[in-house]
Amino acid sequence: LSHDYFKQPNMNAETSMVFFFQAVEKNAAAWIFMIAERWGGSVLLRDAIARATKPLTAGLCLDLKQIKSMQHIKNEQDLYVLAQTLIDMSFTWAMSWISLNRQFQDENLSEKQQLYIQQAVIQVQLLFRGIANWQ
């Protein structure tokens, strides 16, 4: 996803999740590889993936700083931990989404996908509600 993605008008959690899952579907093989090798691959691959995710995490941290509801978080490390958490959650969401596409067909798939989007949105909302009260 590009930085332009974050500048969409009327962006909300559900729209963000839909865009995210569309990106996952377009690049499912890459997601599967990254997820499988991030924890289960050779040390060389695990280290390479860790190096590759650091700039993503740092970039997300910068994006989070721009969000009005994050302005009260002054500790840079706290924002970085939040970015890491979101990156980790994205790997879980991606693999679960890919698994849905493999397990279900037709209208069952659409129904399961909608339920999963709602679940992911609730997870994000709960996370950000907690952050709103972070001191």
Where are these predicted regions, by residue range?
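Hydrophobic alpha-helical connector segments
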Residues: 1-29, 79-86
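Surface-exposed helix-capping loop/turn segments at secondary-structure junctions
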Residues: 7, 66-74, 135
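Amphipathic alpha-helical packing segments from all-alpha helical-bundle domains
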Residues: 22-23, 43-70, 80-95, 118-128
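Amphipathic alpha-helical segments used for helix-helix packing
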Residues: 25-47, 95-102
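Short helix-coil transition/hinge motifs at the ends and kinks of transmembrane helices
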Residues: 69-74, 100-114
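Membrane-interface aromatic/basic loop that binds lipid-linked glycans or pyrophosphate carriers
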Residues: 129-135
